[in-house]
Amino acid sequence: MLFQEYYKCGKNKPVISFEIFPPKTDAGFKNLKSTLKDLVGLEPDFITVTYGAMGTTRDRTLEIAALIKNELGVESACHLTCVGASRDELDDTLRRIYDSGLRNIVALRGDPPGGGEFTQPEDGYRYGSDLVRHIREFEAREFGGRTFGVAVGGYPETHPEATGPDEDLANLKNKVDTGADLVITQLFFDNALFFDFEKRTRAAGIETPVIPGLMPILSSKQIERITSMCGASIPPGLRADLDKCRADDDAARRVGIDLCISQAKELLERGVGGIHFYVLNKSDHIKEIMEALPLRRESGYENRVGAGNPGIRL
């Protein structure tokens, strides 16, 4: 099922999705397989798999996404970026994605390894909108029409490289006008930021689903590193709570999980079409969050939590 079909079918219940990343080691890959059993037991609608820069974990991205869909029976999506890829290489990757039975892609410009400045690849692309256009031209040429669901990223607090919110929103509209079906936002810790962003996207004429992305805080060190990379702000009250937990990761984790539950509840109450959780390749905290959300009556979630999947083969 393509991305957009989930949100058309899910009007009576929120669409729940997870994001994982491909481990760099064989041991990490083995651990992820175990974690996937637990994540699949929560029955997300789909799982996305991030894309390693410069070939670091690109093959594993496709391997994991194919495993999730073809062996675990859950829809999955590969991330695809412009980093280090020529147009011919993108075509080759798109063919491999298609041949693996995958039909959804998260199209991003991507960040270079090491946090350096982005350099446009030779015969490649600089912007996410160019990548979306390339995907649409590829599928028209290869398959005669739209074949993939395509999601792109949105920034409630503005992309760090944009000159301001107006330019950033114009860039997002360009990605949607070029062919994106879905917008998944960067993480945020104040729901007012998301609601304002959603309002601005609608005013700009963006009609595709705009889905909030939530990342549970699991330690003070983790969130400092991630927010420094993506530009997300930490509200003063949350900062004060985390400052009290600098030497206690368990306490910081409690703060993070409680905040994520509170955010998710409000988002669902306000009628968002779904929530995309950045799960950090762990399952215990996500299970706790899912069990705390008001999903049971609307979506039959009581039959999903911990139920597992008898068809799992890992």
Q: Where do the language-model regions lie?
A:
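Active-site pocket-lining/capping segments in soluble small-molecule metabolic enzymes
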Residues: F3, D123-G144, A151-E161, G205-I257, ...
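Active-site-adjacent beta->alpha loops and helix N-cap segments on the catalytic face
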Residues: F3-Y7, A27-F29, G55-L67, S86-D92, ...
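Active-site mouth loops of central-metabolism enzymes
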Residues: V15-N31, S76-D88, G149-E167, D243-D258
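Conserved beta-strand positions in the central sheet of alpha/beta enzyme cores
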Residues: S17, T48, V106-A107, I184, ...
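Conserved, mostly hydrophobic/aromatic
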Residues: E19, I47, I97, K175, ...
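Active-site beta-loop-alpha junctions enriched in small/polar residues
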Residues: I20-P23, T50-M54, H79-A85, G110-D111, ...
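Catalytic cores of alpha/beta
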Residues: A85-Y98, E167-N171, D196-K199, S219-R225, ...
